[in-house]
Amino acid sequence: MSSQLALRGPELSANLCKPEEDTLRVLVTGGSGNVGVGVVRALNAARHHVVVASRGYSPALLPEGVRAVRLERTEPDAYTRLVAAEKPDAVIDLTCHDAADAAVTLRACAGVDRVVVVSSVTAAGPATTTPVTEATAAPPLSEYGIDKLAVEETVRAAWADGTSQALLVRLGAVYRLGADLDGQLAEDGCWLAHAAAGAPAVLADDGAARWNLLHADDAGAALAELLANDRARGVLVHLASRHPLPWRELYERVHHALGRPFNPVSVPAEWAAEQLEDAEFLAETSRWDQVFDLGLLDRLAPSYQERGGPSRVTEVALWLIRQGRVGDAELGAEIQELPARLAAVRTAPGLV
């Protein structure tokens, strides 16, 4: 059920008269994952010949005509052998998690004309000022962000020594039907259980920070256009939503769609980060506005138009609730206790 639902979305327009010389043989590593599903759909719709490489692929997620192969990139030279066997015109790598991965990708794809390495906006660290540009360089806080920055540094070194002109794409958070939706206080879907139960929504700093969610179909459409642009080489480009949504509005939309009252309770983000056992997501990402300068994306992918929006995010949230995919109950209980703990602190002797 979820496999089929995950493929639904706005129709991706295909150019049925696409010249043969514009058709590429594209290898997508990680093509069956959260982002990869949208990428593969878009490439297939654009009439490219797509091969998906993954460690544990899900054939049901792949459009008809897309071929799947196995890749365990930790095996010595496995990636290099796969590229040599498939002879792709282009590679989109969604599985570069650290510097070692990036080095393997660049070595394996040394003879490939077009290479796209997907990084993350977390590589830029907390977005204390917005819009965030490609030149923003605040130190990342999380291990994930630090590793993604190392990916970028490895690719930049290859630019500098002339061994690669891979395109670096700094991707924001991506959602789709069938994938989970994080809340503001934790990288987890427990906020959905609170909404379904009609419990108060616990937000940080009134939920005023704007969250940035890009639909996987939109991510795929943009990456497909970037891949087709011969000028999109040797640069770093942001790919994120043009319609960031305040956390408060996101929570309110879901509560109202469920017919539940919306009674938000706010706690200070800095204080909450000190209380939670795992506060990396709040400290690095969700307490800050996720607003990105997409000017370079506009220049490199001028025909790309984002189709997702708040209504589609709400649709995904409702689907997750119906499926019972509502996060970690213990974590949810910890978050629900925060307002009472804050009240106790504020009324303690000697505190105002």
From Swiss-Prot:
One of its GO terms (cellular component) is cytoplasm. This is 2'-dehydrokanamycin reductase. Mediates the conversion of 2'-dehydrokanamycin A into kanamycin A. It comes from the Bacteria. GO terms for biological process: kanamycin biosynthetic process. One of its GO terms (molecular function) is oxidoreductase activity, acting on the CH-OH group of donors, NAD or NADP as acceptor. It comes from Streptomyces kanamyceticus. Belongs to the NAD(P)-dependent epimerase/dehydratase family. Keywords: Antibiotic biosynthesis, NADP, Oxidoreductase. The keyword Membrane does not apply. It catalyses: 2'-dehydrokanamycin A + NADPH + H(+) = kanamycin A + NADP(+). The gene is kanK. Pathway: Antibiotic biosynthesis; kanamycin biosynthesis. The lineage of its organism: Bacteria, Bacillati, Actinomycetota, Actinomycetes, Kitasatosporales. Its EC number is 1.1.1.355. It is an enzyme of class 1 (oxidoreductase).
